[in-house]
A protein has these predicted regions:
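Basic helix-turn-helix/winged-helix DNA-binding cores
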Residues: 1-61
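Short, charged amphipathic alpha-helical surface segments
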Residues: 31, 51-52, 56, 61-114
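A very general structural signal that marks isolated residues within well-ordered alpha-helical segments
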Residues: 45, 90, 130-131
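Glycine-rich, often proline-containing surface loops adjacent to acidic residues and nearby aromatics
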Residues: 112-123
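Conserved small/polar residues in nucleotide/adenosyl-binding loops
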Residues: 124-130
């Protein structure tokens, strides 16, 4: 199947498909008569899997390790879940800081007292429920 067909079947751009090939995540065969790439059903399924894992924030390097069998998908998902939980915590702290600052009357750069907000959020962070 041609790359145009792969684009239609996966919803990905030509450049994404080529990037996955360049990164050795897929290796389509070549048509001997013209040298064009010939993508298989298996290539399309792998592209879909790779794209899905990317939406979960899993790196190309980690996906390569999964495909090569160096790590399992389960191990990678567990590690990614920890990373996402940490990012959620950091984002919640940033959100709390923004809300605290927005609650102030006429906040400005000149009046910004960083220690006041960081201390308040650090204390609040310790009392946040974890999920």
């Amino acid at each position: 199947m041609k790359i145009k067909d792969v684009e239609e079947r996966t919803g990905l751009s030509r450049s994404n498909v080529r990037f996955y090939e360049k990164e050795k995540l897929i290796e389509p065969s070549r048509n001997e008569s013209n040298g064009y790439r010939d993508y298989s059903e298996n290539d399309v399924e792998n592209i879909k899997k790779i794209a899905y894992l990317r939406t979960l924030g899993i790196s190309i390097e980690d996906i390569r390790s999964i495909i090569s069998g160096k790590v399992t998908l389960q191990e990678t998902l567990e590690r990614q879940n920890e990373i996402l939980n940490s990012q959620i915590t950091d984002l919640n702290k940033a959100k709390l800081m923004c809300e605290k600052m927005l609650g102030e009357e006429s906040i400005s750069y000149e009046k910004l007292q960083v220690e006041q907000y960081v201390t308040a959020v650090s204390y609040t962070h310790l009392t946040l429920p974890t999920t």
